């Protein structure tokens, strides 16, 4: 029940916390959520919150300690509001509380000043109940009057306090979060054990066992450390001192960013961390109940916060609550000092405690939540030196006072503490007491985590900031520039992403905790995709509900107790979901950071895990075992591996440990998926809700996405469903968007996302591996597609509770999903980002943008994935990377793509369809691959899907199928039939329809003229298609089919029917050109699978949004058809010129594709001039497919991937050239020195000439001179009547002997 509450709270919390953070919400929030909020508030309030947490703790002592969340949520929330100071003071009566209260009071005052808290908000905030666990003492609930207010203030932007409270489980390792926040080391020593809120070390989880746990808590702290580390990164950014001892060390191997504060330590430290984690695991096993519950709580908190509803996500989890509690304290301290911006932002709401908790709540002193007031740092008191926590949670360690010190100490201290659980707390408290204090400073870490987690507030994530804010964060962020802070943190995170997983190992011991840690790390990753996190948290609430029994039992179950296996499983699942969401984000980042090899490794592992995860329980266990093994391997492996291991380890520990120690089978799969997700996330950080992203975030995300194919994976699926980790991947894109928006689909979305994330991770690594795995993967993908289709359809309807049914299919998907998902998710991610960034960004983004754009618009989750992501990024990717990426996409590209049922938008994104189509797609793709466009196929399909969806937004499947041209049917059907996906495709058909066939007919609607555009996109065409898409991004988010020969035909058919055009698969490239256009038969069904896989996933809304977007774009294109034509023709000319031989040599059909590149625009340009294709390849396909084919083929087919890179480069150059030429021509055109036709000709020729100049530079002066010469020449010809119908014709040949032909077909020819 608590989990449900939490779930509910989370959803609400994420929504409200983000926006308002009103206390009213608190009640709704599950206790967990409340606690998180309270914690956050406490954090926000600085450590003050911590104290309140303690107070709460007493109330929740037994229950709360174990199920802190439940009590914490509501009671705290309300209590806090009402009791605030009084409660704090009352509770303060407790021995240790008195000291804390003293500190607390100052924090109260402090909070307002620090957080600028909104009085109303803070008051409303539920009060954080912090269990003060002094050493062995029972937790003493500390009233945190200030907590709420501060949290509120902290959450100002968002209702952080509730989350904080909720997150801040009473126990919650107090927080390691606390550590981060309360990090204020000073208090830590005294309060370390008792450390206020829950002397998190001792009993964060188990309330009764606090005394014994104290030592154990230190062990958990290790996990906490790790967990905390994610926050540390931020803190580190804020306070360098901690950097040295970064908890992130485990992650450091990859060279996690020192800014990641936790991760900057040297690899050695990382290793130490890992060792510690292992030790912790052992310790945790000893204190499983306690430690693990604490860990879990912290993890849950981390996950929840990170996901924006940390508390909610894992509300059920103990972690959330404990985390929350610690967090709360953290915020409390942070608020004054740390709450700083994050807290002020309110984004910190969830992360503050998370940091401490996860990082090393217990170990660090657990009490990072020390409620050290600004001046109260001393408060540390005593606070119980009880050794349980280095810094009392309750203590408000003034981050400002010794935040840095504390931070540094904290990090090492946490470790030190780790060794001596009980004593450690004290020692830590003393030497490391600071660590918790640093926790406060580590607010940055919080922030990073928070930022990540802050899915909704996406960038608000800065709980960390709040924590470190006091000194570092404060000065740095001033608590104001959350966005900047988040970006910074994100960057740090990226750097330390690989390290971010480090905490996982320790948490591994406590399956729950690892989860949380993972969550936190994920959060970090999420930080980049805070939105995703936020979505995820919103989504996750439901899964956590099961954790309602959050008792020590639950904790224990997390701790691997079979008894509470089920609930733990549920909890874990939700956590996994959120985690996987965050993880995916984080993973992407990490992966990116780590580099290809690591990525591959991770992916492979993930993939393996995924496969094993497919079988939910049984495999889960094995998966866990495997993960554990991996963990060990990674640990042994060393820095590089460590990160990966950590990331995996986190999942493994989360899931593996859980499995090992009696984890719920389901959770382990979740964990595995989570791991995958994490990697995926690492890959890219595209928040689930782009709408929530700020420009900064978008920029960061876009940058990330553009930078590597890691982005490919879609962080978008906010949270993969924990339960069906296997399936998670597929729907994540669409589902994630949709689900997040719907909330009801959260589990499905989560699953999809998780699956997608893992899949994506896998896919990337599979890029190379995939070829080998293609056969198996294809089968799997096909199944997955099917599943996806089913699940997608189910999920699509927001109302449907498809998530449940979705999960079953998902497991199958999981196994093969990696490949399909990966391409899809990659695209998706980029798409989302781009869409928010710029729907019309013509680069590779263009295709992706629409889908994401729509999604981001919230139109629905348009999981439109365009291979274009890869393509668009290709220019930025290294050739090697790009080729594999494209290959990977090709193999998996078909998998996920489908916009799959554009018509059935509501229907699943057709991710399933993608799967169904996967096999054919793969087969075909393989064929295409052989043609050097293997990757293209999938992409084409995706693009096509989008185009279809746009043009046919809801077209009938029949029409779409019909769309498929006979040729495509012929060419494609053969391939397609093999895929069983055909059956699923039907549903997907609408989207799938075009997706598959080279997607040439991206948007049939646009196209009759644009058919060309889609015509021949093959491997190389793929890029050309990219260009098309860049130019006509929405025009056809046509996926370039790897062997997009059919692209041409598709393009032809596309005009007739968007789906049909897309349908023409690249297989029938040559025949497709004409046939596709001519016959858009219902052949689509067989190809359908192709389409789906390659196509873009579109949810109902997504489809609509996409359609609207495409149409808008089309209108714009039509409006500026002349421009588009010029550009396209110029591009085509250049491209044709560039790769005419290839194009012709490659495939006659593709030759038409020559125009394909510009096709997008070309199509627009050539509505009537389809003949445009006549160019030198096959006779102009009905729609100028010939030209498109020509160009595409030449560009893509022949030259293949390597060519693609070149092509993209040229394309970009071309685009710049076009801009320059246009600028130069404009004056003449305005003066009417030249006619429109001449203008176009000159533009085309000049661009061609410039692009083919030896220097390759675009010199405005030279461009101007060239244009002037052309203008004069045209004028001259006109005067001398030399300008026949096509003035450019004569001059053009002279000017550009070679290009004329191409140029002609490009632009003039169509008219001619």
UniProtKB/Swiss-Prot annotation:
UniProt xrefs under InterPro entries: SCAF1, SCAF11-like_C
Signal peptide location: none
Comp. bias intervals (Pro residues): 206-223, 430-439, 975-988, 1300-1312
Positions with biased composition (Polar residues): 158-169, 254-264, 991-1000
Tissue: Ubiquitous. Highly expressed in fetal brain and liver, poorly expressed in salivary gland, heart, skin and ovary. Expressed in colorectal carcinomas and ovarian cancers. Overexpressed in colorectal carcinomas as compared to normal colonic mucosa.
Modified residues (Phosphoserine): 239, 448, 453, 498, 500, 526, 548, 612, 614, 719, 725, 734, 738, 872, 874, 929, 936, 963, 965, 992
Modified residues (Phosphothreonine): 335, 706, 976, 989, 1001
Residue ranges, compositional bias (Gly residues): 929-938
Region (Necessary for interaction with the CTD domain of POLR2A): 1187-1312
Cross-link Glycyl lysine isopeptide (Lys-Gly) (interchain with G-Cter in SUMO2) placement: 865
GO biological process: mRNA processing; RNA splicing; transcription by RNA polymerase II
GO molecular function list: protein domain specific binding; RNA binding; RNA polymerase II C-terminal domain binding
Compositional bias of kind Low complexity: 191-205, 411-429, 813-828, 1041-1068, 1152-1170
Bridged cysteine pairs (disulfide): none
Keywords for this protein: Isopeptide bond, mRNA processing, mRNA splicing, Nucleus, Phosphoprotein, Repeat, RNA-binding, Ubl conjugation
Description of what induces expression: Up-regulated by estrogens, androgens and glucocorticoids.
Entry's Gene Ontology cellular component terms: nucleus
Top-rank lineage group of the source organism: Eukaryota
Modification Phosphotyrosine, positions: 732
Region (Disordered): 1-85, 157-349, 408-1086, 1137-1209, 1277-1312
Function (record text): May function in pre-mRNA splicing.
Family (UniProt): Belongs to the splicing factor SR family.
Record PANTHER family: SPLICING FACTOR, ARGININE/SERINE-RICH 19, SPLICING FACTOR, ARGININE_SERINE-RICH 19
Protein name: Splicing factor, arginine/serine-rich 19
Protein's organism: Homo sapiens (Human)
Lineage: Eukaryota, Metazoa, Chordata, Craniata, Vertebrata
């Amino acid at each position: 029940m608590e989990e449900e509450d939490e779930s509910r709270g989370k959803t609400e919390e994420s929504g409200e916390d983000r926006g308002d953070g009103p206390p009213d919400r608190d009640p709704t929030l599950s206790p967990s959520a409340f606690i998180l909020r309270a914690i956050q508030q406490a954090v926000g309030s600085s450590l003050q919150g911590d104290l309140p947490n303690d107070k709460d703790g007493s109330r929740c002592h037994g229950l709360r300690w174990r199920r802190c969340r439940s009590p914490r949520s509501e009671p705290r929330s309300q209590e806090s509001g009402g009791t605030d100071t009084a409660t704090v003071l009352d509770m303060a009566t407790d021995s240790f509380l008195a000291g804390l209260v003293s500190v607390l009071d100052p924090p109260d005052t402090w909070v307002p000043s620090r957080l600028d808290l909104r009085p109303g908000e803070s008051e409303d905030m539920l009060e954080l109940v912090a269990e003060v666990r002094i050493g062995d003492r029972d937790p003493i609930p500390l009233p945190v009057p200030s907590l709420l207010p501060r949290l509120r203030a902290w959450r100002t932007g968002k209702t952080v306090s509730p989350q904080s409270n909720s997150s801040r489980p009473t126990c919650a390792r107090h927080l390691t979060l606390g550590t981060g926040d309360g990090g204020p080391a000073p208090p830590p020593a005294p309060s370390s054990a008792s450390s206020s809120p829950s002397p998190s070390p001792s009993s964060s989880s188990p309330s009764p066992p606090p005394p014994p746990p104290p030592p154990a808590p230190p062990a958990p702290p290790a996990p906490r450390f790790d967990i905390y580390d994610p926050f540390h990164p931020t803190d580190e950014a804020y306070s360098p001192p901690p950097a040295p001892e970064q908890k992130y060390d485990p992650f450091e191997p990859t060279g996690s960013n020192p800014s990641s504060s936790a991760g900057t330590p040297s690899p050695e430290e990382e290793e130490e961390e890992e060792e510690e984690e292992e030790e912790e695991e052992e310790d945790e096993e000893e204190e499983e109940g306690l430690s693990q519950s604490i860990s879990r709580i912290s993890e849950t908190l981390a996950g929840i916060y990170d996901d924006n509803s940390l508390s909610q996500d894992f509300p059920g989890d103990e972690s959330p609550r404990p985390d929350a509690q610690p967090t709360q304290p953290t915020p409390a301290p942070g608020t004054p000092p740390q709450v700083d911006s994050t807290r002020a932002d309110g984004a910190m709401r969830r992360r503050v405690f998370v940091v401490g908790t996860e990082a090393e709540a217990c170990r660090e002193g657990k009490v990072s939540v020390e409620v050290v007031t600004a001046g109260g740092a001393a408060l540390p008191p005593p606070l119980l030196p009880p050794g349980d926590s280095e810094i009392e949670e309750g203590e408000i360690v003034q981050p400002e006072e010794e935040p840095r010190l504390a931070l540094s100490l904290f990090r090492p201290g946490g470790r030190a503490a780790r060794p001596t659980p009980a004593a450690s707390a004290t020692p830590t408290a003393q030497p490391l007491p600071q660590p918790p204090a640093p926790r406060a400073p580590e607010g940055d870490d919080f922030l990073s985590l928070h930022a990540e987690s802050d899915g909704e507030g996406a960038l608000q994530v800065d709980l960390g900031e709040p924590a470190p804010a006091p000194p570092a964060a404060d000065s740095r962020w001033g608590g104001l520039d959350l966005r900047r802070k988040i970006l910074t943190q994100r960057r740090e995170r990226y750097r330390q992403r690989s390290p971010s997983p480090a905490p996982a190992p320790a948490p591994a011991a406590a399956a729950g905790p690892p989860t949380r840690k993972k969550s936190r790390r994920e959060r970090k990753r999420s930080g980049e995709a805070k939105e995703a996190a936020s979505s995820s948290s919103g989504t996750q609430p439901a899964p956590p509900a099961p954790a309602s029994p959050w008792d020590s039992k639950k904790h224990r179950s997390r701790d691997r107790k079979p008894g509470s296996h089920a609930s733990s499983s549920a909890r874990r699942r939700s956590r996994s979901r959120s985690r996987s969401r965050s993880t995916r984000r984080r993973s992407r980042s990490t992966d990116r950071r780590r580099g290809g090899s690591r990525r591959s490794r991770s992916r492979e592992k993930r993939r393996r895990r995924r496969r094993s995860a497919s079988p939910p329980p049984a495999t889960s266990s094995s998966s866990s075992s495997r993960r554990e093994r991996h963990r060990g391997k990674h640990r042994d492996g060393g820095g590089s591996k460590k990160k990966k291991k950590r990331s995996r380890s986190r999942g493994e520990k989360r899931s593996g440990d859980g499995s090992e120690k009696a984890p719920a089978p389901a959770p382990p799969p979740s964990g595995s998926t989570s791991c995958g997700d994490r990697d995926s996330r690492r890959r890219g950080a595209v928040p689930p809700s782009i709408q929530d992203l700020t420009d900064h975030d978008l920029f960061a995300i876009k940058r990330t996405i553009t930078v590597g194919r890691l982005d490919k994976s879609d962080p978008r699926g906010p949270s993969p469903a924990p339960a069906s980790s296997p399936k998670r991947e597929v729907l994540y894109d669409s589902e994630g968007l949709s689900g997040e928006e719907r909330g009801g689909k959260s589990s499905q979305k989560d699953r999809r996302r998780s699956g997608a994330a893992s899949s994506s991770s896998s896919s990337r690594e599979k890029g190379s591996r995939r070829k080998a795995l293609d056969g198996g993967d294809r089968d799997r993908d096909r199944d997955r597609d099917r599943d996806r289709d089913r699940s997608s359809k189910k999920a699509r309807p927001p109302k449907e509770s498809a998530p449940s049914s979705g999960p079953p299919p998902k497991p199958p998907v999981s196994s093969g999903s990696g490949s399909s998902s990966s391409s899809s998710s990659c695209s998706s991610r980029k798409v989302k980002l781009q869409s928010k960034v710029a729907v019309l960004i013509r680069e590779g983004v263009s295709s992706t943008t629409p889908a994401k754009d729509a999604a981001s618009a919230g139109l629905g989750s348009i999981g439109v994935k365009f291979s274009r992501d890869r393509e668009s990024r290709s220019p930025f990717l290294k050739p090697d990377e790009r080729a594999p990426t494209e290959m990977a996409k090709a193999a998996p590209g078909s998998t996920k793509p489908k916009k799959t049922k554009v018509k059935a938008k509501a229907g699943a994104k057709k991710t399933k369809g993608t799967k169904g189509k996967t096999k054919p797609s793969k087969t075909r793709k393989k064929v295409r691959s052989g043609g050097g466009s293997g990757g293209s196929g999938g992409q084409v399909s995706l693009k096509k899907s989008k185009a279809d969806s746009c043009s046919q937004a809801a077209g009938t499947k029949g029409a779409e199928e019909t769309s498929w041209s006979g040729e495509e049917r012929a060419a494609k059907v053969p391939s397609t039939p093999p895929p069983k996906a055909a059956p699923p495709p039907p549903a997907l058909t609408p989207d799938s329809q075009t997706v598959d066939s080279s997607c040439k007919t991206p948007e049939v609607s646009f196209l009759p003229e644009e058919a060309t555009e889609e015509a021949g996109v093959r491997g190389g065409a793929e890029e050309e298609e990219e260009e098309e898409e860049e130019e006509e991004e929405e025009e056809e988010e046509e996926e370039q089919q790897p062997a997009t020969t059919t692209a041409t035909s598709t393009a032809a058919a596309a005009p007739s029917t968007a789906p049909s055009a897309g349908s023409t698969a690249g297989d029938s490239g040559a025949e497709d050109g004409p046939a596709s256009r001519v016959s858009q038969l219902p052949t689509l069904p067989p190809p359908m699978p192709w389409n789906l896989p390659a196509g873009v996933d579109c949810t109902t809304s997504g489809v609509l949004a996409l359609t609207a977007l495409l149409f808008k774009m089309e209108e714009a294109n039509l409006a500026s058809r002349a421009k588009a034509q010029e550009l396209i023709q110029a591009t085509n000319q250049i491209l044709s010129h560039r790769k005419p031989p290839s194009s012709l040599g490659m495939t006659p059909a593709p030759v038409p594709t020559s125009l394909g590149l510009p096709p997008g625009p070309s199509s627009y340009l050539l509505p009537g001039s389809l003949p445009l294709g006549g160019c030198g390849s096959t006779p102009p396909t009905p729609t100028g497919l010939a030209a498109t084919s020509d160009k595409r083929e030449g560009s893509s087919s022949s030259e293949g991937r390597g060519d693609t890179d070149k092509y993209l480069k040229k394309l970009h150059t071309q685009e710049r050239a076009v801009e320059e030429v246009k600028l130069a021509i404009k004056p003449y055109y305005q003066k009417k020195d030249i006619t429109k036709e001449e203008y176009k000709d000159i533009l085309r020729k000049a661009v061609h000439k410039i692009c083919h100049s030896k220097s390759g530079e675009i010199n405005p002066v030279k461009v101007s001179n060239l244009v002037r010469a052309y203008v004069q020449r045209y004028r001259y010809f006109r005067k001398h009547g030399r300008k026949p119908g096509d003035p450019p014709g004569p001059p053009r040949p002279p000017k550009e002997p070679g290009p004329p032909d191409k140029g002609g077909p490009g632009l003039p020819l169509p008219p001619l």
